[in-house]
UniProtKB/Swiss-Prot annotation:
Annotated catalysed reactions: GTP + H2O = 7,8-dihydroneopterin 3'-triphosphate + formate + H(+)
GO cellular component, one term: cytoplasm
Taxonomic lineage: Bacteria, Pseudomonadati, Pseudomonadota, Gammaproteobacteria, Vibrionales
This protein's name: GTP cyclohydrolase 1
Domain of life: Bacteria
Gene3D superfamilies for the chain: 1.10.286.10, 3.30.1130.10
PANTHER family per UniProt: GTP CYCLOHYDROLASE 1, GTP CYCLOHYDROLASE I
Amino acid sequence: MSSLSESAILVRDALVARGLETPMKENGVSREEKKERIEEHMREILTLLSLDLSDDSLEETPHRIAKMYVDEIFSGLDYANFPKITVIENKMNCDEMVRVNDITLTSTCEHHLVTIDGKATVAYIPRGKIIGLSKINRIVRFFAQRPQVQERMTQQILVALQTLLGSDDVAITMEATHYCVKSRGVMDATSSTTTTALGGIFKRNPATRHEFLSGIR
């Protein structure tokens, strides 16, 4: 098992303490073994669906799915993949809102394992620390790369940034299309879901909250 960074451990422990961690159980299975076993099971599933895996279009599909699950769309289940975080001292004494708009994200609904496609806007008020801007995007992506519900994902990003910045003054809003609604069930192709998580001054101060929410495109 890969050793975890200090940032990864801090964020994971903060989420566990708040009951916000994605339901997971460590099984001690290596990445490569996971791929092998997922490939075996996926081969069985596709065969049960009457697909001919000897066809040259399908023969590598179980392998591709296994690799995709472990290395890509579910890579956020492994905190060894938590992004390297750069946090610096706020020597400039910056005290105005920092906002990153329209962070694109693709996640997976944990109920049906189909796509969630959306964007997030993240803001914070610098106190003692400033975080590298690209790190905000990477944190959003990390939590998107696992089976999710949007409400929890929004809270996870909030708590992760609060933990790394040492400040409660963080805000997130997320708008996403859920393909479990769009491509099955009710088959609603136009609706989207918006979730918001506010901390510190964004929750306490109506003016700060309004500045954040009114600036969202």
